Amino acid sequence: MGNDTIANMITSIRNANLEKTKTVQVPATNITKNIGKILLQEGFIENFREHEESKNCFLIFTLKYQGKKKKPYITTLRRISKPGLRIYSNHKEIPKVLGGMGIVILSTSEGIMTDREAREKKIGGEILCYVW
């Protein structure tokens, strides 16, 4: 049984948000790098960088907070398609999160992208997670 790196990343970010931690470290894989790029592009995180320690490679996410109470920009981060139950959708049936306020991250034949990009390109794929 393998590790679910996406669920590991989501849980690490969720826990860091609860503790109001500025940075979080997750194992680097191609999928986590691409999801990190999307989160950065959509404005959910401040920054992320790659860090190599001995032979292990990590991504360090700098989380974004607003106001004096440090309210996190990422309210909810939910894993949808899991290793035991994959969820796929064509471009017409990709769900909208909070009426378009949140994003759906999909794994498509053209790479990992948001729901808006997938609808524009008219391609479906595996629904990885919801972010809002």
Swiss-Prot record:
Gene3D superfamilies: 3.30.1370.30, 3.30.1490.10. One of its GO terms (molecular function) is rRNA binding. The gene is rps8. This is Small ribosomal subunit protein uS8c. Belongs to the universal ribosomal protein uS8 family. Keywords: Chloroplast, Plastid, Ribonucleoprotein, Ribosomal protein, RNA-binding, rRNA-binding. Pfam families: Ribosomal_S8. It is found in: Plastid, Chloroplast. Its main location: plastid.
